[in-house]
């Protein structure tokens, strides 16, 4: 099939380029996030590995990814392990403070492209930041069973992060949540009170969660969730200790409700991004998206972010 043809073409091209025959190997789940088959070309002046992950259920064949790594030595592209994880003292050195502006720097960029891999791309950035750059978004997508069109459901995001955290013995702590029916009902009450004040349309259906986000008014949400200084302070106080310690915060949002500082390839629906800082003087949140270099460091008003 097309996958096998493409794989053989790549292998033949690498063999012709290097002038040596590859060595085949397998990496188990103990050595990798998912099982992979691989081939390596090692010579005096360089090293290349080619790896694939596939699965089969009955007669159905699923090709997950083909990836290639190249470097000047075999060690430079070797798969790392838990010993390469960064220490708390190391990550705190990435925090930059300028007056009342605090930003975590040096978080590697992973571009999710058009695939809707926001959860795994964002998680891969965190792993790389913590010194675990042997974990990539394609492996994480396979582990979390993330499809190209299934990366934007908020509940699915939480479940996928839980799977990833369990696999790597990483604790995930929820700082703020709208993930259950009680949270939603409380939000709905606050939203309708704010809508009355602003003389805007209320939401009557208590069960249509997705419909609410599709039609929510940004100004009403801001008044409901960030209408008082205490609401803003409470939200900022929850993330401040993590940012000061050099720990980025996962941030699940609904796009299309408040203005964005840059045009996005995704304009509506759920999305996962990173909170990397804040400016207490300007009352802004500093964040990062997994859409390439232009989205490394962006800013929006705290009230918009909380909404």
Task: Please annotate each region the language model reported.
Residues 2-5, 148, 262-267:
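Short consensus segments that form the blades of beta-propeller domains
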Residues 194-201, 209-288:
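Active-site-adjacent substructure of cysteine-protease-like catalytic cores
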Residues 35-38, 45-51, 267-273:
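Short, surface-exposed coil-to-beta transition loops
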Residues 1-34:
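Long, charged/polar, surface-exposed segments that mediate recognition or autoinhibition
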Residues 25-41, 46, 235-238, 294:
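Short aromatic loop motif centered on NTY/YTY
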Residues 9, 13, 117, 121-125, ...:
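Extracytoplasmic/secreted proteins, especially bacterial periplasmic and envelope-associated proteins
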Residues 56-102, 256-267, 276-307:
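Noncatalytic regulatory segments and standalone regulatory/sensor domains
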Residues 56-213:
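Active-site-adjacent structural segments surrounding the nucleophilic cysteine of cysteine proteases
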């Amino acid at each position: 099939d097309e996958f096998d043809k493409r794989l053989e073409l790549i292998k033949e091209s690498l063999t012709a380029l290097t002038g040596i025959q590859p060595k085949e190997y397998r990496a188990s789940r103990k050595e990798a996030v998912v099982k992979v088959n691989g081939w390596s070309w090692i010579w005096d002046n360089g090293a290349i590995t080619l790896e694939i992950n596939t699965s089969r259920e009955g007669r159905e064949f699923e090709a997950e990814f083909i990836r290639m790594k190249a470097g000047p030595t075999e060690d430079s592209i070797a798969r790392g392990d838990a010993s390469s994880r960064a220490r708390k003292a190391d990550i705190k050195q990435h925090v930059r403070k300028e007056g009342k502006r605090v930003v975590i720097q040096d978080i590697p960029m992973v571009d999710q492209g058009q695939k809707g891999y926001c959860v795994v791309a964002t998680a891969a950035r965190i792993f790389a930041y913590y010194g675990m750059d042997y974990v990539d978004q394609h492996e994480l997508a396979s582990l979390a069973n993330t499809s190209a069109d299934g990366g934007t459901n908020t509940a699915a995001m939480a479940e996928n992060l839980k799977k990833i955290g369990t696999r790597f013995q990483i604790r995930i702590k929820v700082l703020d949540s709208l993930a259950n029916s009680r949270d939603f009902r409380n939000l709905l009450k606050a939203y309708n009170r704010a809508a009355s004040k602003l003389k805007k349309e209320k939401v009557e259906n208590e069960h249509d969660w997705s419909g609410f986000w599709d039609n929510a008014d940004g100004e009403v949400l801001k008044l409901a969730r960030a209408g008082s200084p205490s609401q803003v302070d409470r939200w900022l106080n929850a993330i401040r200790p993590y940012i000061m310690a050099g720990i980025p915060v996962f941030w699940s949002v609904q796009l299309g409700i408040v203005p964005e500082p840059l045009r996005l390839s995704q304009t509506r629906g759920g999305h996962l991004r990173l909170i990397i800082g804040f400016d207490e003087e300007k009352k802004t949140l500093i964040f990062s998206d997994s859409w390439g270099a232009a989205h490394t460091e962006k800013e929006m008003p705290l009230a918009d972010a909380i909404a």
